[in-house]
């Protein structure tokens, strides 16, 4: 079965097994990968895991995601846990889709955590 993934969607993924401090378990993940790669059915996908273990004022390491559609709990995006996963780890979705205004905040947080200078 071919997944029809879209940039900015949130899907449920099985992130086990893990190593060290990696986020594990079955949990929602934000699809961060470029839409052209998704459309080409690339076998892996760049994601950001979510957690319901909320921490206040933790930007840029975390961004709060409000419940919507089938994402039923308030969550934090774990910006410092960005990783690529095999598409076989994606098990259900989309749970919801993030609006462009929120994704702009995600891009800024990712750039800051990764040390990209967007001002240049």
Annotate each PLM feature.
Residues 22-26, 30-67:
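Compact nucleic-acid interaction/catalytic patches
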Residues 3, 67-120:
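C-terminal terminal-subdomain/extension
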Residues 16-20:
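Short, charged beta-turn/beta-strand-edge "cap" motif at the junction between a beta-strand
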Residues 1-3, 54-55:
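Short linear motifs in intrinsically disordered
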């Amino acid at each position: 079965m071919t997944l029809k993934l879209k940039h900015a969607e949130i899907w449920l993924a099985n992130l086990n097994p893990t190593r060290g401090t990696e986020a594990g378990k079955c949990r929602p993940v934000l699809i961060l990968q470029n839409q052209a790669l998704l459309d080409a059915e690339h076998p892996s996908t760049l994601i950001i895991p979510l957690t319901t273990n909320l921490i206040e004022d933790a930007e840029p390491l975390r961004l709060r995601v409000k419940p919507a559609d089938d994402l039923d709990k308030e969550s934090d995006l774990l910006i410092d846990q960005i990783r690529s996963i095999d598409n076989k780890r994606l098990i259900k979705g989309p749970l919801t889709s993030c609006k462009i205004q929120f994704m702009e905040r995600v891009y800024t947080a990712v750039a800051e955590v990764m040390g990209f200078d967007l001002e240049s």
